[in-house]
Amino acid sequence: LITCPYCFARVAENRIMFRCSGGRGGCEARADEVLGRHRGGVPPSLPPVFSVRRPGRRASCPECGRETSRRACPQCHSRLAAEYCANPGKIVALVGAKGSGKSTYIAVLLHELMNRVGAELDASLTPCDDRTIERYRQEFARPLYGEHRLLRATQSAVTDRGRDPLVYLLTRTIRGRLRTRAESLTLVLFDTAGEDLRSRDVSELHLRYLRAADAIVFLVDPLELPGARAALNGTALARSGGLDDDPDSDPLNVITRVTELLRQSRGPLTVPVAVALSKIDALRPSLARQSALHRARVPSGALDLDDREAVHEQVLALLEEWQAGVVGRYLRQNYTDHALFGLSALGAVPEVESVGAGGIRPYRVEDPLLWLLYRFKMLDGVRG
């Protein structure tokens, strides 16, 4: 079975549909009501989809006879990339409380995977559809990297139904003693507003998204923890604004809500969960000199397990210090496999609406993903 990364339906390989290539001599475009219902808004005008008895790499349209290689999900009619169908990989979901910096994190993480981290891991990051390419360029890369503007807060899917996830395939070549194999991880990045997790209008799609995930990354804004705010210096405190009274900004509320959505039986959940404190740069001046969060990760093409454990314990201690130790205890009670992280997408406290004068200097943004690659046996772990 393949999980559609758009509607999250489980689809047997022999039920994958094809879409006519259209064009000269092909079928005329017509309204695709199924895709329209999935995306919301006006149904797009596209050549028709059709099913075949034994799907292969290509299929002939029964109406016009033209060959096509465009695969489509039978449930929502979204295009399924050939590479994704051949090697679908694990699905990683991203969830964050309101104001936790999800959009900025997505922009910087993808940029690092395409460049510095991708080169270190000998990994390729492939967008799975044209909408992903266009959305990343227009909504993430251009404003942040091209214009150095801060990204706007995520709109709730209730008011922004046309928002599709960004879908990428991260592929690594794993060289074993006997053979070489390609392993893939599917990053399905819904830039999910915190309130979406309690809205009846969209909860079904988000529920399928979360339950289809093989791992979840939670982004937590530590500046929403009163104990952490007390440690801010004057500049960081002035730029951070006040505490948000909205319950969707409370990290524990969001983690609890997701946990209850996922729970289908008693006992701890087995899905690996990475919980990352974003904007850690604002708090670094208050950390002890020997803190693991003062260290940058040393690039090695592997996961440094000693460093990983040191950062986890440091974040756990900080949560206790900030009177938020309940977060760590809740995770321990409800998940069999979880890890804590501290990161910063920008690397410094930004100006009111723009990146700081020092530019974008990401700090440990890749750490949660490296840990998940290690958990999925796609990355070696080393000590010493």
Regions found by a protein language model. Give the residues of each.
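Flexible phosphate/Mg2+-sensing switch loops adjacent to catalytic phosphate-binding sites
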Residues: 81-85, 114-153
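Hydrophobic anchor at the beta1->P-loop junction of P-loop NTPases
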Residues: 92-94
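Conserved GTP-binding G-domain of TRAFAC-class P-loop NTPases and closely related GTPase folds
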Residues: 207-384
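Switch II of P-loop NTPase G domains
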Residues: 54, 163-216, 223-231, 354
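Conserved lysine of the Walker
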Residues: 102
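A conserved segment at the C-terminal end of the G1
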Residues: 105-115
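Walker A (P-loop) phosphate-binding loop of P-loop NTPases
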Residues: 99
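Long, basic/Gly/Ser/Thr-rich N-terminal segments
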Residues: 1-87
